[in-house]
Structure formats: structure tokens, C-alpha cells
Amino acid sequence: MFSSRDKAEVKLYFDSNNEENQKILDQCPHLYQKYDKDVTINDRINNIEDSEPTIKNGVTFYPPYYLYNSHFMNYYGSYKIPKLNLKTRREILVNPIDGGTISLDFFELGEFKEDTPTIVINHGLTGGSHERYVQYFAQRAYKEKGFRSVVFNYRGCAGNPITADRAYSAVQLDDIKFVTEYLTKTALPLVKKWFLVGFSLGSAILVNYMADAGKDSPYLAHVSISNPMNMVECTKNLSSTYINNLIYNKGLANNLKRLFRKFDGRLDKYATKEQIMAAQTIADFDDLITSKMFGFETAHDYYLAASSSKSIRNLVKPILFINAIDDPIAPTSGFPWKDFKSNPNTILCVSRWGGHLGFISYEDHMSWSDKAAVEYLSTFLDDNNNNNDNDNKTE
């Protein structure tokens, strides 16, 4: 039924000279477990190849037998798992820089204290707080450790109106900076432990924000899931097969077309409506609109600036990356393996299967990546690394 154990091994890339990484992984059983009595986390493997993992890992990840195909995994994760329809409270914000409208959806999962540790969630390309992957993550974070979760909905997404000429992108950081300042100084000023989690495009925004903010960022730790690490490679992969091009490349381009219809005449300076509607791929659309909107000549130039891969070595706060080798949207080609293994603040976790934002486990048909992410963030809850599940929520 299952493939070999070696294929299923969850591979970890990190700087093992940093004792904090070792302490963190010891507390995350869905990320790391001792492989055997002869290999421990303190025994760094002297790898010849940069793409070889840092340590032999006892953790394996298997999807259900019918989700070994990444396309089935993506479809199941997006459309077949039951909807949660979690209750939210919305706050609408207008960025004073240009009048763009964004929103925050607070998941109302229980009664929270004023200082409850809080996760800010960046959704994917054209998503929002309604997405299954967002809601299941927020629910697990609350049930496991009592986290409060707040979703940052981008311009034009999740019902937000278009009130400015600019949209959003991986390099547009004005909105995440505005949201961060509003949450930490106005909405929830008593919260001391802030966390930032990004999915897909949201993880690219997250990494670019981290690189820009440096140590001034109020977020204690971060998680990036299905990050399109090298966007040039992502574009190649989206066009590499008939299925990838049909389902993802054209599908995501059509999502962008629907979103940008809300801009009406605001896009006339970049392209005609006929040109926009004729775009067949994400690269076509980014060449016409996104690149020009954010000051780049071509989509390729935008991808080089937007890719997380260029920033890994410069990240100065803790972050966990989770990606799958079979991800058709965010392939692992072009990953800066050496940078992950030399930066003491980063941990990269790569599974053989999982697709894009899928990671459905055969054990319980729930997201393995959600479990791993919550475990990782939980290690930062207690200053003495002694977490208490009930400290942060009241029933």
C-alpha cells in the first residue's frame, strides 16, 4: 500500500549548530523524531550535496492511498474536506497611503484574554478567511494551544471593495505593515506574543516582510506553507505539463481575471480589457498588469524581486518552512538549500507528498502540516519552553 520508508521520510534542513533549533525540534513530534539509537539530532550529517538533509529523521508522512497523486491531493484539500464555516468578526481598514481597502477577520472560537497569543494569517493568491486551509489551521491552533487567529484579507479579496489603483503582490508590503501596526498598537495592544503564518502567496509576502522589517518586526516566530520559493522556477513548472498548464496556470490566471474585473477603468493605463481577458497564464497576466503596477518592466523582473529564495540567508527571526516535492505550483527546484542549512533562524521541512496546501495524512485525513506548524509555534509560547495548553483560552 505504501511506498518505501525512505521516500516518506520528512527531510529537515537547518543549522544544527544552533542549539535552539535542536530544542525546538525535540518538542515537535510531527517534525522530528529520533531515527534510531545510532543517529541523534546532535550528530550532524556531513553532507557532500547541499540538497541532502541535515539529519536522518524518524518522521514519515504518508497520504491516503487515493491522494498519492498531487492533483487529487490539491482537489481534495480545496473542495472535498467538509467546510467549517467558522464564525468571524470583521474589521475593515483603509490604508492611508493610497486609500486601499483591506479587512481583518477575527475567528470567534471562544473567549480570549486580552493578552492571548495571536496568529496573523496571510492567505493564498485570491483567497480569504473562508478558505478551508485557513479555517482548519485556525481551528487546530485554537484547540491545541488556545491561539487566537486573525486573517488579513487582501485588496479585492474576500468581499473587499477596490478603492485604490494598486492591488496586492508579494512585494507590496504597505498593507502588511499597516495591519501589523494596527493590530499590535490599536486593536490588541496587550498581546505580547505575535505570530505570522503564510500560505502560498501569503508566505511570499511573509518572507519579504520579514526581510524588510528585520529585528523590528513584532512577530516572535513565523510559518511558511507551500511557499513559491523561486517564482521563476514556479512559472516554468506551471507550463511544464499539459495538466499543470490547464488546471493551475490557466485556472489561477482566470481567478486573477475575476478579481481584477473589480478594478474597472483603473487598469486602462496598463492594458486594455481585451488584452487582460486574452491572458492565458499567470505569467501573461503578470506581464500585463502586476509587473507594471509595482514598477517592473516584465513579469520575470517581478519574479526575481518577489521570490523568497533570495532572502533566506538574511532572515533574523525564527521561521519554519513546509513544502512538498510534488507541489505542482511551488516546486522545490531552485531552493537555496545551503542557505537554509547555514541560517540559524530557519528550518525547512520537505515531504515527498502533500501537493499544494494539501498534506492530508492517511492516519486521520487531516492536515499533517497544520499539526507540525502548531507544534512549532507552541514552542515559543512559554519563555521556559514549558507550554500549558489551557493558559491562553477560557471556556
UniProtKB/Swiss-Prot annotation:
This is Abhydrolase domain-containing protein. The gene is abhd. Disulfide bonds: none annotated. The active site is at S200 (charge relay system), D327 (charge relay system), H356 (charge relay system). One of its GO terms (molecular function) is monoacylglycerol lipase activity. It is an enzyme of class 3 (hydrolase). GO terms for biological process: medium-chain fatty acid biosynthetic process; medium-chain fatty acid catabolic process. Keywords: Hydrolase. The lineage of its organism: Eukaryota, Amoebozoa, Evosea, Eumycetozoa, Dictyostelia. It comes from Dictyostelium discoideum. Residues 117-331 form the AB hydrolase-1 domain. Coiled coil: none annotated. Its EC number is 3.1.1.-. It comes from the Eukaryota. Pfam families: Abhydrolase_1.
